[in-house]
C-alpha cells in the first residue's frame, strides 16, 4: 500500500500564555499569514487565532490552520511550532490538539473500516496519550458502540448518530461541516515531532481503512500501517507515560 503523504489536513492547536495579538505579530514576521478572529467554524485560506471558552490559563487561544497539504503542510506547521516556542506558549490538561483529515472521497466501506479500526486500536492509542485524553468529556471513546452497530451503518449520518456528538475521539460531525473527519484525542502540544507523528499515524490509518480494518486486540507492534520507526516512537511514548 502506498502511504506517501500528500493528503489534505488541518490542525487546531489549543494553548495559553501568549496574547493572540503578540502571537499573530510573531507569526506574520515569520511569513505565516494569520488573522485574529472571534470564535467560528469557517475554514479560512489563512491561519486564524480564535478564543475557546473550554480552556484554562492566562491568554488562552486556539490556533487553527488553513487547509494544509502533505509534506509541504508539515513544513509550514513546523515553522508555526518554532514561533510557539519563541512566544513561550504553554499547554495544560485542558488543551487538546485536533487533527482534520480530508474525507471528501470516502466510500461508506472506508468510514466503517475507519471507525472499527480506531475502536479496535483505542486501548493502544490510550496508552500513548496522557490520562487526561483517555476518557475526557471533549473526546469520548468509541467503546459504547458495538462492532455490529458500526458494520450495519449504511450512511455517514447513520454512523454519526451511533457514535454520538462531536465530542468523541473520532468526530464525524466534521464531515457535514468541512468534508473532513476530525480526530480529537491528542493532548495539547507545541512539539512538532509529536504533531508530525500523530498526523502521519492518522493519515496511514485512513489510508489503510480504504482497504480493510485493523482487527480487535491488535498490539502496537502489529499495527499493519506503521513502519518500524513509528512503532518505536509510540513504544517509547507509551513507556514514558506509564513511568
What positions do the PLM features span?
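C-terminal substrate-recognition regions of SAM-dependent nucleic acid methyltransferases
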Residues: 96
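C-terminal accessory/tail domains of diverse enzymes
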Residues: 1-90, 104-243
Amino acid at each position: 500500500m502506498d502511504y506517501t503523504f500528500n493528503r489534505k489536513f488541518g490542525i487546531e492547536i489549543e494553548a495559553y500564555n501568549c496574547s493572540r495579538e503578540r502571537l499573530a505579530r510573531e507569526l506574520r514576521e515569520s511569513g505565516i499569514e494569520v488573522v485574529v478572529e472571534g470564535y467560528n467554524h469557517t475554514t479560512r485560506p489563512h491561519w486564524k487565532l480564535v478564543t475557546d471558552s473550554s480552556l484554562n490559563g492566562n491568554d488562552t487561544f486556539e490556533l487553527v490552520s488553513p487547509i494544509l497539504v502533505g509534506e509541504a503542510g508539515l513544513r509550514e506547521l513546523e515553522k508555526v511550532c518554532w514561533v510557539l516556542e519563541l512566544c513561550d506558549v504553554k499547554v495544560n490538561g485542558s488543551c487538546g490538539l485536533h487533527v482534520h483529515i480530508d474525507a471528501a472521497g470516502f466510500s461508506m466501506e472506508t468510514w466503517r473500516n475507519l471507525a472499527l479500526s480506531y475502536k479496535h486500536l483505542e486501548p493502544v492509542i490510550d496508552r500513548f496519550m496522557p490520562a487526561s485524553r483517555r476518557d475526557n468529556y471533549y473526546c469520548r471513546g468509541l467503546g459504547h458502540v458495538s462492532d455490529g452497530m458500526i458494520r450495519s451503518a449504511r450512511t455517514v449520518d447513520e454512523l454519526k448518530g451511533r457514535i454520538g456528538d462531536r465530542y468523541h475521539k473520532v468526530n464525524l460531525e466534521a464531515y457535514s461541516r468541512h468534508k473532513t473527519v476530525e480526530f480529537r484525542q491528542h493532548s495539547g502540544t507545541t512539539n512538532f515531532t509529536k504533531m508530525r507523528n500523530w498526523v502521519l499515524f492518522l493519515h496511514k490509518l485512513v489510508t489503510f481503512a480504504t482497504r480493510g480494518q485493523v482487527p480487535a486486540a491488535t498490539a502496537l507492534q502489529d499495527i499493519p500501517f506503521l513502519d518500524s520507526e513509528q512503532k518505536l516512537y509510540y513504544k517509547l511514548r507509551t513507556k514514558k507515560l506509564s513511568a
